[in-house]
Amino acid sequence: MANEINIYEPRYLAEAVRTAPQIRTFLRDRFFSNVKTFSTERVDIDIVKGNRKMAAFVHPMVGGEIVQSEGYETKSYAPPLINPAIITTADLFLRRLPGEDIYSGKKPEERAAEKLTDEYNKLNDMTTRREEWMAAQVLTTGQLKVKGKGVDEVIDFGFTNKINLENTKQWGKSAADPWGNLCDWKQQVSRNGFANTDMVIMGKQAANLFMADSKILDLMDKRRFDIGAMAPKELEGGLTYYGHLNLPGVDIYGYDEVYLDDTDNTTKPLIPDNMVVMIPSTANFMRAYGLCTYLDDDKKWHTAETARLLRDYVEHRPDRHFLELQTHPLLIPDKVDSWLVATVC
């Protein structure tokens, strides 16, 4: 029929991707907001480590000194494939279903489009949660472990600002000094990573120990020493705002969002309970997407420079109609050592 609608045509699938509601993910959206798509399967990125070298004094008759290009390293990465699929039933909604009101105001293609969008949202939600997990892994370890069917590798970004408090220096123990730690760590990042870390994100146990620390409570009670204020309040998406410290100049947050670990089927926090992350609130790391490719039913290869590719295909024995999402994301902290992570308890 000339007017028959095929909801699986690329233009309809692309519209489903475009109109889908966005999931809000704190770590991914806040710190990896520099989104770029690439026309290649590999992504080449300049990893920057700055310095504080000063310009030299020179005699007027000698002339200027040539400044050597330094401080960055170009690395090539192959973004991992994320490729969830679902058996779609959206095409069934093009026909009136048994028991459906024949006077329903919705057109068949509208019902089918709604079902298609629901199915895409399910795939997109899973993919977005994986990207949030990737952001957490990169920020808390400086690495990304890519492990799945047929793939097992570690992408290391060369991150070195890692602290591990031991023995009585751990928070909650006799020699603990959370306030002093934050002051020292901020200075460390300023000197080694050339960044102003004005935001602290704590795991649940770390946050509880920080808020209960006797030195912190004592400093807050000193009327002539305005160190800051703690006024906890819950925000959306598992985020809690605890307050602000004027010295060392940081806002303190807790992040309680969890994920289902598919390796052991247990629920785990994205920010480990015993960990603290100090990071610039203005961090603008890269969220890169490699080229998507697929083979169609006519055995022709297609490519797309996009963050999400949605397509359908048919398999037989048994006959099934699949809806598939493809993406090649890689979250890249291109300004290495501009943040710090610490295991505090």
PLM regions and their residue ranges:
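N-terminal alpha-helical "arm" segments
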Residues: 1-43, 332-345
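Assembly/oligomerization interface modules of large self-assembling protein complexes
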Residues: 34-102
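A general structural signal for short secondary-structure junctions and capping/turn motifs
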Residues: 35-36, 189-194, 199, 268, ...
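Extended, non-catalytic scaffold segments that flank or surround catalytic motifs
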Residues: 43, 53, 154-161
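Long, contiguous amphipathic alpha-helices that act as assembly "spine/axial" helices in icosahedral shell
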Residues: 84-159, 177, 181, 187-205, ...
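A surface/extracellular/periplasmic glyco- and lipid-processing/surface-interacting theme
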Residues: 165-180
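Ordered core of a single globular domain
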Residues: 180-239
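Sequence/fold signature of self-assembling virion shell proteins
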Residues: 217-345
